[in-house]
C-alpha cells in the first residue's frame, strides 16, 4: 500500500515515483517517469508528464499541467490554472519534441493564478510571479 494518497478518480502510472505524504486529488494523472517529492499537494485536474521533477512540499493548484522539461524545486507554489510551455514555436503539423526547452522553478518560488511561464526560463529562489503575468525573461532570486 502506498504511503501517499491518490483520489479514486486519479491515475498514477507504473514508473512514476511519488513521495511519502503526497496527496493527489480528483481527475489528476501522473505519468511514467515523473518524480514527485514528499508532502506535495496536487489539486484537481493536474497532469504531470514524463521526465519532470517536483521537489518536496510543492503545492500545485487545480488545472495545472507540468510538461516534460519542467522542474519544480522544494516549496514551490503553482497557482490555479498557471501554464508552463515547453516549445517556443508550436505548430500542429511539426513535431517539436526534440526542441523542448527546460524550465526551472527554484526553491520557494510562487507562481500566481493564470500566469504563463515560457519554456527555457528560470524563476529564482523565492521569486514571485503575479496572477496573469507572462514573465518575458528569467526572474532573479
Question: Would you name each region that the model predicts?
Answer:
Residues 2-8, 14-16, 23-123, 131-133, ...:
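Flexible, glycine/small-residue-enriched loop-and-beta-strand segment within the central core
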Residues 126:
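P-loop NTP-binding/switch modules centered on Walker-like glycine-rich loops
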Amino acid at each position: 500500500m502506498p504511503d501517499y494518497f491518490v483520489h479514486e478518480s486519479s491515475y498514477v502510472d507504473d514508473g512514476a515515483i511519488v513521495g511519502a505524504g503526497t496527496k493527489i486529488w480528483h481527475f489528476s494523472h501522473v505519468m511514467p517517469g515523473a518524480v514527485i517529492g514528499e508532502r506535495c499537494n496536487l489539486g484537481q485536474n493536474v497532469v504531470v508528464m514524463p521526465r519532470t521533477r517536483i521537489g518536496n512540499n510543492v503545492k500545485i493548484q487545480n488545472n495545472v499541467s507540468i510538461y516534460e522539461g519542467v522542474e519544480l524545486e522544494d516549496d514551490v507554489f503553482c497557482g490555479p490554472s498557471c501554464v508552463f510551455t515547453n516549445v517556443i514555436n508550436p505548430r500542429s503539423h511539426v513535431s517539436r519534441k526534440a526542441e523542448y526547452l527546460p524550465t526551472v522553478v527554484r526553491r520557494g518560488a510562487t507562481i500566481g493564478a493564470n500566469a504563463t511561464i515560457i519554456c527555457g526560463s528560470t524563476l529564482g529562489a523565492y521569486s514571485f510571479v503575479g496572477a496573469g503575468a507572462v514573465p518575458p525573461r528569467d526572474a532573479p532570486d
